[in-house]
Amino acid sequence: MKSDIPQKKTVLRLYNDNFQNYKRYNIPKAQLVIADIPYNIGINAYASSPEWYVKGDNKNGASRKAGKAFFGTDTNFNIAEYFHFCNRLLKKEPKEKGKAPCMIVFCSFQQLNTVIEYARRYGFRNYIPLVFCKNYSAQVLKSNMKIVGATEYGLVLYRDKLPKFRNDGNMVLNWFLWERDGKNIPRIHPTQKPIKLLKQLISIYTDPGDVVIDPCAGSGTTLRAAYELGRSSYGFESVKSFCEAAWERLLPGAMAYRPAEIAEQTSLFVEG
């Protein structure tokens, strides 16, 4: 597979581990933490999608995805623990203007207020809402019943000072086109974000040589986008199958970290 990854002294690492164990890896603090948190939609993940049925046709009956979550950890996400650890992963607030770090969180529309509230509790008092516009919708089965969803949402979260901002003199609007990746980018994760979109966001809030961390890396597209831009990237993904697929198909040359034994840890996902 051809790769656009530059031959620079930047780092690309994906850890098959929970990011709560970040201290064991001695990774540097991040200029940008960017993550797609679980949407907590559980067994309704494919509810309005043709994937609910075999070959997309209800005449064929329900598929194996019917009544299933996107993945095992897409329920009971502990958002308080998430912000507690992300606050530690980011650089401290600098004295200088124009150098502050930030977080970008992808979330559902229903999660926006919750994310804002918990972010404030952990020191991220300011935010900028983001909207991502698609030219398609996953809600195909509802298309003759109602207006269907074709947007994704996110938040730029920061502490006090405005974060580093690299706009090259151009106005940056708070909505972005969501363009799907080409066939050269393998589809590994059900909520995988387009590399082109991730590159836009990373370019706005970081410089070459900065560190980008994705605590819920999934397929690793954030890591690849950052690395191709000359940013060192570190990611954590607890699901082994996603890590294996990312190392093999999406992140050529990545440092693969497979802990032989992962110590007992407090999970971000509440049991019960």
List PLM regions with ranges.
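Conserved SAM-binding loop
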Residues: A246-W247
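Class I S-adenosyl-L-methionine-dependent methyltransferase module
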Residues: Q110, L251-G272
